[in-house]
Amino acid sequence: MGKATGFLEYGRKENPFRDAGERLHDYADLHTAQGTEERHCQAGRCMSCGVPFCQSSFGCPLHNLIPEWNDLLWRGEEREALERLLETAPFPEFTGRVCPAL
């Protein structure tokens, strides 16, 4: 899944906060979105664990298949990644806000 050495090559990148003055005037997202290239690099950080923590009983409470999703993003198959995500998370715009991994 992803790039075998991706976690060594790409640092974890958080989505930056939008300026507070800008946020006062709308109800848009608190963070700025990552671009396509940045999403690609972050998806490449998935380490292809033997037993992925994100798939354990302590991992994703929705049982999302995160390694598969990251691999699709890494390969540039964004539409397929979305379809895979929607199989287990019908409302990712809500559940993604409370994800314990973020």
Predicted regions and their residues:
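Ferredoxin-type iron-sulfur electron-transfer modules and their immediate structural context
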Residues: 1-102
